[in-house]
Amino acid sequence: HSTTKYMDGHALTVGGCIVDSGNFDWNAHAEKFPGLTTPDDSYHGVVYTEKFGKKAYITKATSQLMRDLGSIPSPTNCFLLNLGLETLPLRVERHCYNAQKIAEFLNAHEKVSHVNYAGLPDDKYYALAQKYMNEGRTCGVISFELTGGRDAAVRFMDSLKLATIATHVAASITMVLHPASHTHRQMNDEQLVEAGVSPGMI
């Protein structure tokens, strides 16, 4: 999971975290996980699944992978992430509330052809959101498509006054991204559609 997003809340740090419940049977799929089910020469030939059982993955991550990749955040980053955790429930609840209102507004707008948001009853993931999400709240991220395609999306982005244009999402401010001209700008329209990104998507 990215800790840069909601956990931080202000896009001040870059990082990630591993959540491992210790319930996955690595040996049942041994061919897919040779790093856990075969000897690790860098740790005296230990086979993590044999030595650590259900804790095989998290043990490998905190011993061999941290050693090799150096994926340890600085003390300042840890402080900022911990600070962000203090207000996480309040912020996420408000993100969800705000996103729901915006999604409903966009869904009724004549210049919007489609809204992707699991909090809307006509969304293909609505039933799952109601089943699995706390009180049916989904998230703070919405995507929508303007009827005018790429040109309309560019005009929309150029007209923004309150929201910040950014490739980073899920912080405490409202951020907007046009993938066709930002994260996927190297692709032509045909390639965008193949990648599941329409030219007019915001």
What are these regions (language model features)?
Residues 1-4:
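Short beta->alpha connector loops at strand-helix junctions that form conserved
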Residues 7-141, 145-178:
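Active-site C-terminal subdomain of aminotransferase-like
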